[in-house]
Amino acid sequence: MTSPRARAAAGVSVADLGAYQQAVRRVLTCDLITKERPRPGVLDQVLRWADEMARDFRELLGYTLIATTHHVRLVRHLDVLDETQRSIFSRKGKPFDRRRLAYLCLVLGSFQRSRIEISLADLVRIFTPLANAIDGLGFDPAIGSHKAALVDVLGWLVDRGALRLSDGSLEWWARDTERGDALYDIDHDICAVLFKPARPVQHLTSAAGLVHEPPHSNPARRARRLLVEFPVVYYADVEPEVADALRAPGLAEDLVRFTGLVLERRAEGVMLADPGGVFTDRPFPGRGNAVSRAAGLLLAKIADLLEDPEHVPEPLPVPALADDQAGLVARMDAGLPRDGVVAELAWSPSEAEPPSPDDRPAPAQAPFVSRSRLETMTTELYDEFGAASFTSAWQQDPRGLLDAVIGFLSDLTLLRPVPGGVLVLPAALRYRNIRAALPTRTSGGQLALVALPEPTAQQDTPGQQDSSGQQGSSGQQDPSGQHGSSGQEVSFTQEEGR
């Protein structure tokens, strides 16, 4: 006889459940919580529930919660690679390029455990030969782009408390590398938890080694992870056993009680919806930058096109998630250095047999919208609202804005870029009546894109930090105000209650 399944938040009273769920959302959406980050007071709120959360994260998701009196860090154990997580490495809203990512790894590797402080001059002396030993990288403080990259990396570490400035100034050094200097205290405990890969990266022969578990182990846990980490999970994207787990009521009850979010079931898949729209690293719809707001307007135009009786949509197969994963691993492996890998310690992927066609779900189909049609829609938006409405960054670059919008909506699993255009995924049509990116006229008569007022139903705002404060789900806000499921698996293309 099997023992009964442990309930999420089993030791939390009804009166305290909201505070517990808020702490869970904080941990999921902030890569590192310290006394100052994301703001003072949050660490104490989270530490109150550390023991209970550690148990629930371990049993529900297989994650490890590291909690001390100084910081809280959730260590995820991945069974799928997610390229949307790149936004965790950014500075002032700008994502790190490969140079900055490489510099970050080299700087962290330069900190000796025996040293509790380091001057910027000493750090540069240690770091420079390491960077120059790597073909195509290098570091020269006389080159502005190199110096700017190092400044961003050190600022990123300061933001997380890994370094604390005790004397001098980084800005002074950036202006004058000969005379400027800074002295930093090193927090080795935080440095140690910032990067905890599944295996030592110097012994990997493939990026597949960054995944902790094979894809077919523990379908229920994989289903929970997909729901927490991705905006929407489509049944056609996952193995049949994972789809069955997603349909199981026990899984939904656990996650709803654990996170305080609303599980929305539809014929095509499942999603965790946040009525407040704050459980996310990419606020949508209605808040955020011009890209987010333009994305809402473009979705509205796409919905108008697909619902036009004179338009006959062209359905095309949606590429399988497994193929996307294989392509991502192949791109990463193409740049993987082979020098220095110790053959006796190296990890290589097992020679697994490819799944038979019968084991793979039938590919879903989605309507195709051509690139030329999308460009026409973008031009119409510029004509309707005026170029100035899209901020100075995009006034003269409508195609660049379109590229950014497509990437943004792709990260939210609403569009799927394919050669020649995009596929419109089912959840995109939740926003057919979008009201969060509306035009209003300024005092000068210029049309402007503005967001709806901030939601008042929930004061918890774990996603409202800089874009680097993310390691969790891209949960979406329900634009129609319909937060729950009707109990029937209607399509994303249908509105509940109709």
Locate predicted features.
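Positively charged, polyanion-binding regions of nucleic-acid-associated proteins
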Residues: 98-119, 294-368
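Short acidic, hydrophobic short linear motifs in intrinsically disordered regions
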Residues: 24-44, 114-139, 232-237, 363-396
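Long, intrinsically disordered low-complexity tandem-repeat segments
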Residues: 458-488
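Internal, well-ordered domain-core segments that constitute the primary functional module
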Residues: 107-190
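A short, conserved structural fragment
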Residues: 61-65, 154, 158-169, 258-264, ...
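Eukaryotic partner-binding/assembly regions in large regulatory complexes
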Residues: 1-91, 167-183, 190-319
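C-terminal engagement modules used by replication, chromatin/transcription, nuclear envelope/ESCRT
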Residues: 164, 168-208, 273, 411-460, ...
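Short amphipathic alpha-helical interaction segments
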Residues: 48-53, 142-159, 394-408
